[in-house]
Amino acid sequence: MLTSSGPRFLRDGQPHLIVSGAMHYSRVHPEQWADRLRRLRAMGANTVETYVPWNFHAPAPGVFDFTGGADLARFLDTAASEDLDIILRPGPYICAEWEGGGFPGWLLADPAMRLRTRNPAYLAEVDRWFDELIPLVAERQHPNGGRVVLVQVENEYGSFGDDHQYLEHLRDGLLARGITVPLVTSDGPRMNWLLAGAVDGALPTMNFGSRTGEHLDTYAREFPDVPPMCMEFWHGWFDHWGEGHHTRDADEVAGELRTMLSHGMSVNFYMGVGSTNYGLWNGANHDGGLQPTITSYDYDAPIAENGALTRKFHAFREVIAAHIPVPDLPSDLVADPPALAPRELEPVASGVLTCDDLERLSLATVDTVPGLRAVTDAVPEPPTFEQLNLERGLLLLRAEVAHAGGPVPVRLHGLHDRAHVFIDGRLAGIVGRDEGVPETLEITAERGTLRVDLVVESMGRINFGPHLGERKGVLGGVWWGNRFVNDWRAYPLALDMIGGAVAAACALDRDTTGADGLSFRQLALDVASDEAGADANISTSRRGRGFLWVDDAMLGRFWHIGPQQSLYCPGPLLGAGAHTVTIIETDAPLGAADGAVVLVAEAELDGVNSASLAAELS
């Protein structure tokens, strides 16, 4: 069992240095879990750390899913079989650049909900979630024959609030549900963060990426009887759309690691394993404007998004080997994982999904998603995502407006985050928050009754800071000239959960020539028997902005502004035979007529298109 004695950890009574790597099971295909864990162990890690995203397991109130890619028990058991201890961070808040910091969007349907506080409605839902989750974890603790050795209380709470009754409720809830291994907290290295995030009975750990010596001094001065640990060693970083790709020099961060280990500081590499925000699971930040996170979560990790062992892997392994025993590096891990050869994908269908098509798609799939509902009888205000239990995706809002003729300003108040505005089926414009594009359009139309369709997109729920818990949709209503529009119907599209239906809708034989809507195309991807199971890098650098599926699996978003210009497709999705790539494009390529979709040899993660970005924001 892992314990602590003064400034050091003990494992089964012997001094122990934790060398851990973060791997998010929710971001890795489950058939690749064992491979990535094996690579982590080969680097010298003796532990794996993972978050548990609440919303990944709870698609609707009282509905819980621990199957497939959400099979947490399988992941924990696989880690144990690869000879790794486990640090579990169950939240309920996780940050992690994950959709909403792990909070289900349906929590926000309650206007009185206050996240990360002792708000009774919030705590009731946390308790219901922990009743499902924590017993599964408790039976896999080290004293019970498993490999879970540490469990974290909340996450970086010192950067958010000071409701210590809330932290105590979480701590007591973990203990009451059977957690017996040591508890920890995790906060930035400033004392005000560490103190605000602390709770009695939990060991404080720090998150940082540099100035290790200063943080060791803080431990020695402020926490002399606590084993020093960097719970998040930020040797890399995440990317936002429209910004540069973040990397850090391998030798520089290896030097920080050397300082940690030589002074007895345990460490968790954040990230140890690069991965992917499949579907629409990316989060967002807000710093003067919305900053959605890209689809890739490669993070410049020692083990790349595709499993390749990077220079950082070897630099870290060398430092680790000087402090703890490191297993031999298996020869089959040295070469990069196989990838499909570069080729251009052959188009097989293309067209437009009109707003009527989107309505039909919504009504055909609404009953297949837990808790999802449409509004087919008009209501006075445009329903929000949360009111429809729409976690992610698109929302078609439809109304009819009596128009006197001529020009009129149309404003979408509180738009979160982006909308295509159609008048009588024709695209009038695109509006968005914080993109350099206005929330107001000037509409000119003949006198009469007009049909107004808004296709609203959530670009990712904010996962950190004071904007955490923002709702999605048109929150303040639609202003037509000098009056509100008050008769709305709503049709939700949970795109990442209805991939098969999306592909089928795009495959329908119909003439959409001259129609406005969201353009689509389908392409053939044929995999030979000797290529089966290889990964693919699907380059969208010649396309605009939208969503991409392989068969019924949504890989994620693409956007010409970069930095990411290709999407990673894991090999388990690519068996021998014919596959279909489906693209729904919300924005056409700038200055290009019709760009091809191609497979490329390597991931394109560092391709900020500055010209496209300037045009997008002009």
Predicted regions and their residues:
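N-terminal carbohydrate-binding accessory modules
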Residues: 1-47
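The substrate-binding groove and active-site-proximal loops of carbohydrate-active enzymes
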Residues: 18-30, 53-72, 108-128, 152-163, ...
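Aromatic- and acidic-residue-enriched segments that line the glycan-binding/catalytic groove
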Residues: 62-68, 81, 92-117, 167, ...
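Catalytic-core region of carbohydrate-active enzymes that cleave or remodel glycosidic bonds
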Residues: 176-177, 207-304, 308-315, 319
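Aromatic-lined ligand-binding clefts that engage carbohydrates, nucleic acids, or primary amines
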Residues: 407-422, 452, 525-551, 558-559, ...
